[in-house]
């Protein structure tokens, strides 16, 4: 990727790239250990917080909200908000990994659209390397999920497990933050888009998050359901939305 002209700018500052690679390796190792030995949920959560902090520490942070240019307010708040979002998305994706092909299919669709738009956005606005970084991550996810999905389709011959689902969630969160958290709404004005056109311009960027709305809702309901019953929030059950839809036929 470093030899492709469009992606060369990403490697000009190796810090974020190395942090993402290191975080990916760590979360895969923890996921594999969990798949083998069923680690306590506190260990998994600690690992998720650690990898999220590593990525945020190297500058991939939510600095502003794209609509209206609202800034987060302080470096500490930006750091903590980034960690929260990454951990939230990782667990939301992990929680929907209950049916053959579900995570790989959702990721393939959302990141396919995300890749096209982030690439076009990078070309039109001449942005910083964070736009190109988002495109690179989306391209990696599209390729990985497209290659994995045929083997994970019902009846699956390969399973993603916690190692795969947490990795997909991590990369999806980082790619989304790299664009939406670093974007300058003024750049759209420079290319002729007025304020009334900002929302349509950002809709494709928000598509991956829109697709994750259902997993996030399922994650929230699952945590509330399990905690209220005095169980670990990571205890498996068959009350997820996709299980209920499957039972309904």
How does the language model describe each region?
Residues 32, 61-68, 98, 154-156, ...:
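Glycine-rich, flexible loop/turn motifs
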């Amino acid at each position: 990727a470093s030899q492709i002209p469009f992606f060369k700018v990403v490697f000009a500052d190796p810090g974020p790239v190395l942090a993402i690679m290191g975080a990916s390796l760590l979360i895969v190792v923890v996921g594999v250990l969990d798949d083998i030995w069923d680690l306590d949920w506190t260990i998994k959560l600690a690992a998720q917080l650690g990898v999220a902090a590593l990525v945020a520490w190297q500058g991939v942070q939510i600095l502003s909200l794209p609509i209206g240019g609202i800034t987060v307010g302080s470096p500490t708040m930006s750091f903590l908000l980034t960690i929260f979002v990454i951990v939230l998305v990782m667990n939301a994706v992990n929680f929907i990994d209950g049916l053959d092909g579900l995570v790989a299919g959702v990721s393939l669709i959302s990141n396919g659209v995300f890749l096209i738009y982030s690439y076009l956005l990078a070309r039109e606005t001449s942005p910083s390397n964070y736009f190109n970084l988002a495109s690179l991550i989306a391209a990696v996810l599209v390729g990985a999920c497209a290659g994995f999905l045929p083997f994970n389709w019902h009846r699956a011959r390969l399973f993603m497990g916690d190692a795969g689902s947490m990795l997909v969630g991590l990369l999806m969160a980082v790619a989304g933050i790299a664009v939406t958290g670093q974007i300058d709404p003024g750049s759209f004005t420079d290319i002729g888009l007025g304020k009334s056109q900002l929302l349509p311009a950002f809709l494709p960027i928000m598509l991956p998050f829109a697709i994750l709305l259902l997993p996030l809702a399922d994650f929230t309901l699952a945590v509330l359901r399990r905690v209220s019953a005095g169980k670990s929030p990571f205890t498996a059950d068959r009350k997820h939305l996709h299980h209920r839809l499957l039972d309904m036929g």
